[in-house]
Amino acid sequence: MSTQILASSSQNEKIHKILRPTKKFQPPVWGERFLHYNISEQELRYKQQQVEELKEVVKKEIFGESAYDVSHQLKLINVVERLGLSYHFESEIENELESIYNKSVGQNYILKDENLHDASLRFRLLRQHGFRVSSPDIFEKFKDEDGNFKECLVSDTIGLLSLYEASHLSCVGENILDEALAFTTTHLTEFLANKKEHDDPLSREISQALERPLRKSLERLAARHFISIYENETSHNKVLLQLAKLDFNLLQSIHKKELSEISRWWKESDFVLKFPFARERIVELYLWILGAYYEPQYSMARNVLTKIIAFASLADDIYDEYGTFEELELLTEAVERWDIYIIDKLNPEYLQTFYKELLNSYEEFEQELPKEETYRVHYAKERFKELLRSYLEEAWWLKEERVPSFDEYLKISLISCGYHMLIVSSLIGMKSSIVTKEVFEWLSMDRKIIRASSTICRFMDDLAEHKFEQEKNDEPTAVECYMKQYGVSEEEAYDELNKQIANAWKEINEELLKPTGVASPILVRVLNFSKFMDLFYKNGDSYTQVGKVAKDSVAALLIDPIP
């Protein structure tokens, strides 16, 4: 909140003039590129039919044969998942993995001849699907008498890569996986350093993994990357590859059509003219939500949640950049009451505009739902109210030029990051029997998995923007608050926050193991929101300053089809 009020006297009359910020955010880089995209229903149906036909072939070829050994079947499942096709074969994959789990873990059957790659792959796939497998039981045999990973493993590059990926499924206190991560990172980095060319498939995989392991990668981006690698493997399955390409391009067409509709909503609402001080990032916001769920059946959910996150972004800029504290108090109170008849109490006009658009949109969400599901919107409203209360608290810190303690900061900032609001709101448009009132009640509590995802969101945002925030003299970040409470240097604060981010990932992994508090397809949204933070905030704030990461991601998922 950078608004100031200047007072001057003239003929015994005090005149107050509000100085609004003159700084403007980077303009949108996409223009109206997505506004006019269209694809006929006939063309979509044709593409869907092609995908359905190939799906049946794949079912028979891969999941219809029960004679394969465990190693072979795990590798097939891995390829299917990495090609982005797992959502087509959820029950088949789950059945196969449950069978493998019962054979190799549930009945204490030890695969003594299992190599490092196979053991790591088995562990990773089972953990990804919520099976509670013991890391020491699987990986202790790869250690020497001194408790270190055997030196002979250094030459097994494929095994090292597989172990590296598996280590990112660790839970709190799994020391053997922490050691595995350090061991594999060191030797995979050395492998690349000793190679003059990095164009071969293995080197490309290692480079990608070191930048972003599979556990932290958005599924569609990872699929796009792997399809090109898999195509260059001499032993690739042609039917699988063909299905992966067709499916990717089909989903891209569906997503582009959705983005076109969202872009028209943004343009017709005239938000750019009504809120010229705010970031115009509707394409990036849609990408954010696409990261949470890409499957075709969640089209309505994406539409609803993109609009909600757009309002959250507008509110963020109102509270951070534009409004006076008195205006922010008025808006917070009005949203708390959620009553269109009090709109006249909001001044200046931009507050009325925001309030009216917000309430009208949530009313439209209710109208789009069956009557028995309209209760969902109530839970989303409550989280949005909570979000604005946290924004107001942070605005007060800035107004008072106050740096809170780290503990006090966390109470507010883990709400103001917006992830609790988004996670609850993400269920509004999900057409699924697993979304019930009990699920909303469960998610509305302070759950460990939501707190962990919010921690990743808040700390990665703060670390990415710390220098920028300091130059703007904006509200304090986790860095200043940690330094203040614990009397440490900036570098020490950075190290501690990064440790807490790593620990939060482990907590998410643990919360996704069976039995879960609510159905896994719901909790996966929490995981996916965390993945997006790693993409957009690992090397800076790619939302506010749209650069290569954002541009490449949008191009890969929403512009360029796979040939």
UniProtKB/Swiss-Prot annotation:
Catalysed transformations (reactions): (2E,6E)-farnesyl diphosphate = alpha-humulene + diphosphate
Job of this protein: Sesquiterpene synthase that catalyzes the formation of alpha-humulene. Can use farnesyl diphosphate (FPP) as substrate, but not geranyl diphosphate (GPP) or geranylgeranyl diphosphate (GGPP).
Any one Gene Ontology BP term: diterpenoid biosynthetic process
Cofactor note: Binds 3 Mg(2+) or Mn(2+) ions per subunit.
Name this polypeptide is given: Alpha-humulene synthase
Organism: Humulus lupulus (European hop)
Binding site for Mg(2+) 2: D316, D320
Keyword Iron-sulfur: no
Family designation: Belongs to the terpene synthase family. Tpsa subfamily.
Keywords: Lyase, Magnesium, Metal-binding
Enzyme Commission number, as recorded: 4.2.3.104
One of the record's GO molecular function terms: magnesium ion binding
Tissue-specificity statement: Expressed in trichomes, cones and young leaves.
Origin superkingdom: Eukaryota
Residues bound to Mg(2+) 1: D316, D320
One Pfam family from the record: Terpene_synth
